[in-house]
Amino acid sequence: MMNLGSLSLSTSKSSKPMVSISFWIPYFTHWGESLLVCGSAPGLGSGNVKKGLLLKPSQQDDQLIWSGSVSVPPGFSSDYCYYVVDDSKSVLRSEFGMKRKLVVPETLTGGESVHLRDLWQSGDQALPFRSAFKDVIFHHSFDVKVEKPLGVFMNKSDQDDSVVVQFKICCPDIGEGTSVYVLGTPEKLGNWKVENGLRLNYVDDSIWEADCLIPKADFPIKYRYCKVQKEDSIGFESGGNRELSLHSIGSKQEYIVMSDGLFRAMPWRGAGVAVPMFSVRSEDDVGVGEFLDLKLLVDWAVDSGLHLVQLLPVNDTSVHKMWWDSYPYSSLSVFALHPLYLRVQALSERLPEDIKEEIQKAKNQLDKNDVDYEATMETKLSIAKKIFDIEKDQTLNSSTFQKFFSENEGWLKPYAAFCFLRDFFETSDHSQWGTFSDYTDDKLEKLISKDNLHYNTICFHYYIQYHLHVQLSAAAEYARKKGVVLKGDLPIGVDRNSVDTWVYRNLFRMNTSTGAPPDYFDKNGQNWGFPTYNWEEMSKDNYAWWRARLTQMGKYFTAYRIDHILGFFRIWELPAHAMTGLVGKFRPSIPLSQEELEKEGIWDFDRLSKPYIQKKFLEEKFGDFWPFIASNFLNETQKDMYEFKEDCNTEKKIVAKLKSLAEKSLLLENEDKVRRDVFDILRNVVLIKDPEDARKFYPRFNIEDTSSFQDLDDHSKNVLKRLYYDYYFQRQEDLWRKNALKTLPALLNSSNMLACGEDLGLIPSCVHPVMQELGLVGLRIQRMPSESDVKFGIPSNYDYMTVCAPSCHDCSTLRAWWEEDEERRQQYFKEVIGVDGIPPSQCIPEITHFILRQHVEAPSMWAIFPLQDMMALKEEYTTRPATEETINDPTNPKHYWRYRVHVTLDSLLKDTDLKSTIKNLVSSSGRSVPANVSGEDINKSRGEVIANGSTKPNP
């Protein structure tokens, strides 16, 4: 039987003296949960949590302490981590951040006792080690020279009346020439005087530590960490004093290791700019923003006091070979980059004059108000092909290309083959590719063989991806050196006709479609057309596809936005034949069972789950036109009651029928209006029957809006209303929480990028606690408050673990929003700005300045503004109609994503007034600003860190 809380590596035959290692950590658990420590060495489970050391709980003052011990030989070393487990030792939660390191010095002779006093590492405490901070913003703190090995004790516990205490603190943001001290009540800690305090040594990964011999009589002790700069300025950590008491110290030689987590300071805050890659304009680009334009954008960001540049997805979307592909969230490949962003003149240093002239001509022709997607793609690929024909042998035989190919061939070869087959069959629908519809590795190798006549075409796709990689890598490295975080975007889905669904068909539910229920963006819901993920299948290889996807993204970006993070809790799943997003169901979810409904007196399931169509409804909706609708779409089942005909009983069939009627000139009414009205009749249901189990049902969203519901008796209405609210707002919470805690860590552990979640829309109550637990940064848009009882968000009330913004790419810009609604404008002017009277009809620079100042002064970690909203600070940039600056219209599934900034980055870089205005806004709010090219200090408030377990800045 296991001895709870203790473990020994010694055997009965061994007489070697052992060192006792005791673990001690405060952590509040729920009923049925325990804490366990697992490490890489055999004594701590060899990485197998089931074999780890189970800790035992005890109440000490107001803390629940978990402790246990293990006996190890001197020289023992191991990584270790704490886990929350259930009774069967299955992991419920684990710590975040880097693994802890345990090193038992060889200088110990055995018989000593080492007490590890740890603190749980939560998700937000791991943020300083994400690449956005470690490699970009705080990179100077990780370049400090190591002064001593980790874990070595500089003092020996050879006095019975004293204890060696090793103090250990993480300082992710440390200035040049700055030292870290611990000061406190005992004499060895200087009696609070820095000149007599204990100076810590840097031991790597922003960890500072030192030890001293403290008399037992001095305990309990109080202490705090501080930073001391060359000029003797002292910066104490915020918060109260730390305390250390001796609880169970015996007569052995005692060592205590105090791992005190993060240096407590005012939370670090920064600002950034958001703009789609295609929207950027420069003097060098051809028709669209290009990866190399990011260098100019980074320079502008640095000059404007901004630490971050945020882009929309940049993966290849070339599914249809037309402007529909301008939609950046419908990936042809989640690994390949989009040829749209290629700078063709950078493909070679020896371009022939005729190609140079062709590029210049293309620049002039494509320098339009908006992106001409089709012309730009055609032109760039045509020019790139001519350069490829000249450069291919030299490029494909180069060591840099060979290295790129060997590191990326797992996705690059299927991508090139897919592009060839797409063009050969003139469709991306791989179900139409005959023998190639079913992917196999053997078929792939034959397709890309050097012996094929089309091998040159395959190599062209390799060539394009190689140069896109080179150009984006150069821009990414430039941003890192400038102290600017490059933030990418992770789409929630992939296109149904994509490389990924071709190669990994088992990972997708191809008979379904992904969307979102009705919300701020669209009252009818959204249908994005992506197949939903088969999470059960993905889990079998520990989410290898996701891990590869995030690893690839991490080559270029140091932060990323998780599009529709709610999809990792539950997704709004629609049948593949649906075109709108209203009649869906959540997956996973607990449906209403037939037995459950029958117990409530609900029996007529056909009545509730089939479209409820009465003659009077047809007359109300279509007027005199109703007989035409009835004769073409419906069958009469009984007097004045109808059902849909077999050839038009889905949304896709209805669209096909309407198209046929229009072609025959039989449709006299507006086709779009008729389609919407017929869709309304089709969706006039109360319950949606599960397509895989006829005894399970889902309440239709906005159930009370349907005439089918309104025509029910009061008893049925009351029952169904109660079950509706239970389904959507109560019964799923625990299921969705557990689902997110399985899927999201797979993403977070796949790369070192800083993860931000887009948590807008219909938010289950489990979402924000899980995001906080995982250290995910949320999103707050002022016009879309997460609180249901307010119309406008209050930035000063936002949590620290958020990005705040006045608008985003899925809604109108600040200027357009201001002009859209007079009543709302008046309300905002009075309630938020605090001014009575009539507001200006346009969002003048003074109003823009007020709104941006509101946001930079918010507690949020990041304030990220669309470039259009920043340009609205200056009147000369507001001459373009505000409505033309909108990037996306979520209500239009065929929106053309083509917005281009009407001013070049070259011009913006010369505009010192705008840059100065933005930089002053940022710096005056206490947010960090990057160092300029002359190397001035990054900011005045040196020593800021990520909030230590806090959701708001300390006062």
UniProtKB/Swiss-Prot annotation:
Q: What CDD domains has UniProt attached to this entry? A: CBM20_DPE2_repeat1, CBM20_DPE2_repeat2
Q: Name one GO molecular function term.
A: heteropolysaccharide binding
The cross-references to InterPro entries, in alphabetical order and at most eight, read: Carb-bd-like_fold (IPR013784), CBM20 (IPR002044), CBM20_DPE2_1 (IPR034840), CBM20_DPE2_2 (IPR034841), Glyco_hydro_77 (IPR003385), Glycoside_hydrolase_SF (IPR017853), Ig-like_fold (IPR013783)
Look up the record and report any one GO term of the cellular component aspect: cytosol
Q: What is catalyzed by this enzyme?
A: Transfers a segment of a (1->4)-alpha-D-glucan to a new position in an acceptor, which may be glucose or a (1->4)-alpha-D-glucan
Q: What happens when the gene is disrupted?
A: Dwarf plants with yellowish leaves that accumulate large amounts of maltose. Increased tolerance to cold.
Primary localization class, coarse:
cytoplasm
Lipid biosynthesis found in the keyword field:
no
Q: What induces it?
A: Circadian-regulation with a peak in expression in the middle of the light period.
SMART domains the record matches: CBM_2
Q: Which GO terms describe its biological process?
A: maltose catabolic process; maltose metabolic process; polysaccharide metabolic process; starch catabolic process
Q: Which residues carry this modification: N-acetylmethionine?
A: 1
Q: Which residues lie within the region annotated Disordered?
A: 925-955
Q: Which residues form the CBM20 domain?
A: 13-122, 157-270
Q: Which UniProt keywords apply?
A: Acetylation, Carbohydrate metabolism, Cytoplasm, Glycosyltransferase, Repeat, Transferase
> Please, which domain of life does this record's source organism belong to?
Eukaryota
Record's subcellular location: Cytoplasm, Cytosol
Query: Which family is this protein grouped under?
Result: Belongs to the disproportionating enzyme family.
Q: What does this protein do?
A: Cytosolic alpha-glucanotransferase essential for the cytosolic metabolism of maltose, an intermediate on the pathway by which starch is converted to sucrose in leaves at night. Metabolizes maltose exported from the chloroplast and is specific for beta-maltose. May play a role in freezing tolerance. Temperature drop induces inactivation of DPE2 that leads to rapid accumulation of maltose, a solute that protects cells from freezing damage.
| Protein's name in the database | 4-alpha-glucanotransferase DPE2
**Biological source species:** Arabidopsis thaliana (Mouse-ear cress)
UniProt lineage: Eukaryota, Viridiplantae, Streptophyta, Embryophyta, Tracheophyta
- Provide the gene name from the record: DPE2
